[in-house]
Structures are given as C-alpha cells and as structure tokens.
C-alpha cells in the first residue's frame, strides 16, 4: 500500500493537470503506459517471490496427504485478492490528480481494466513459479515482462510487427491493458486537442490519437474479456504445472498391521502359557 501511494504521488507530481494540447496528449499516453508497466511488475514479481518460497514445502505437505493441491491453490488465489485494494487506491489517486476523462463511466472502466491486468500479471507469475525452479522463475519473470513491454503498443506500432512475432500480442496482457486504457481515454467523441501551429504533427482529437497507434478498432469490452480469458488459461496452466510438480514425490502411505489384541489373547490357551513358563 505504501509503495502504491508513493508511485501515485510521483505520477501526480509529474503529470498533474495534463492539458488539452499536443504535450498533453503525449503526457496522457506516457502516464497510461507507466501505469500498465507499474501494475505488471508490482503484481507479477511478488506473486513469483511468495509462491516460489512456498513451493517445495507445499509439495512435500501434499505428498504427506496434509491437503489437496486444489485446496491449496484456491486458497492461494483468494488470499491474493485483498492485495487489489492497494491498486484501487493507486489508480484512483492517479486518475483524478492527473486529470483524465472526468466521466464516471470512464473512471469505472479504468478501474476494471487495471484490475484485469493485475489478475493477468498474477497469473503470469504463478505460471513461472510453478513451472520453473525458483532461481529461473525470478530471472525469467522480469525478462518476460520486458518482452511484453516491447509489444505493449507504445514502443512498436502494432501494424509494423513482423508476421512471425504477431502472436505475442495475443498473449500480451500489457497490450490488452494499454490499448483498452487508450480507447477509454481517447474514444470519447468530445475529446479534442489544440495544435501548436508550428507545422509539426497535430492530433486534433482522440480518434487521430488512436489511429496513430493503430488502436482505432479497439473497444474496452473485448480487451477486458481477452484479459479475463488469458487469466483463466494461465491459472489453469499454473494448476496443471503444480500438480505435475507434486507427482514427483511418492505419497506417504503407512500401512499398519494392528491385529486385534483380544483375538490374539483368545487364540492363546492357558495351557500354552503354562508350557512357555515351564520352558523358561
């Protein structure tokens, strides 16, 4: 919570009161992408750290029959949900201090988009933590997010992505979040921006901004649904990987041979007892 408030105040100090000129367009885009990037790292990496530390302990306890894999995994998912409250605080502070679209519906869409991104980032972290050793997961996590950042929509135009790498955008939760946030912010027909008049590039309205980044066909609802579908698929994959990790350990099955004491005593006659005592 503390770090989220610090980041929110930092963004507020840098982007506070963005204008409706061309610099304001650039600042809005930069702030939106930084929000996506911050939420990606702050959601995925803690998920990797926490689960990787518990992984071996959980697998051993499951092998001993302490609890089922599904019970642990569901409890882990539920335990991660309260952490979203700090993201609500972060996004609310940034949204109103920076001065994004004041429409309440746009604000609610903004919250929905960032929550879906956080869930997808947590799912990415769970996949890495369950499918890789601890050291590899901690190293591969930031590298994976960096690749997703390149295809997020601001550093590389979606229309210029090579054909062989276009599939990355379909599994890139940062792209889904950033494109949806841009559509939410600049998709308003009343969004207009002033031009400097110095002969440079001018983006007079939100439609021109979306077209520049190849987001003109992007809508919020489909992007949110894609994020939810991606999250569900990644969580299922993480669960399968956890089950496979658990199967490497032989379940502990202690078979105790405990015949009834009364039957043993009844099977021993008094004569047998006396005979054993005479032999002694």
Residue ranges and their predicted role:
Residues 1-279:
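Membrane-spanning alpha-helical segments of multipass transporters and channels
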């Amino acid at each position: 919570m503390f770090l989220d408030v610090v980041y929110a105040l930092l963004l507020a100090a840098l982007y506070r009161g963005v204008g409706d000129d061309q610099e304001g367009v650039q600042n809005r885009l930069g702030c939106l992408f930084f929000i996506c990037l911050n939420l990606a790292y702050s959601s995925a990496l803690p998920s990797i750290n926490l689960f990787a530390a518990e992984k071996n302990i959980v697998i051993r306890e499951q092998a001993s029959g302490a609890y089922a894999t599904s019970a642990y995994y569901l409890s882990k998912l539920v335990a991660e949900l309260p952490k979203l409250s700090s993201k609500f605080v972060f996004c609310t502070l940034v949204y109103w201090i920076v001065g994004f679209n004041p429409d309440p519906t746009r604000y609610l869409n903004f919250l929905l988009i960032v929550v879906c991104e956080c869930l997808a980032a947590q799912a990415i972290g769970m996949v890495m933590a369950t499918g890789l050793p601890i050291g590899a997961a901690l190293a591969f996590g930031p590298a994976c997010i960096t690749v997703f950042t390149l295809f997020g929509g601001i550093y590389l135009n979606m229309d210029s992505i090579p054909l062989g790498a276009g599939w990355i955008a379909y599994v890139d939760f940062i792209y889904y979040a950033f494109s949806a946030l841009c559509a939410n912010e600049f998709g308003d027909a009343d969004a207009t921006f002033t031009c400097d008049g110095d002969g440079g590039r001018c983006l007079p309205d939100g439609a021109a901004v979306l077209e520049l980044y190849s987001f003109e066909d992007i809508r919020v609802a489909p992007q949110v649904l894609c994020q939810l579908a991606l999250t569900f698929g990644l969580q299922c994959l993480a669960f399968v990987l956890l089950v496979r990790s658990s199967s490497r350990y032989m379940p502990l099955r202690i078979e105790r041979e405990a015949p009834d004491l009364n039957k043993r005593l009844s099977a021993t006659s008094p004569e047998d007892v006396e005979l054993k005592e005479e032999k002694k």
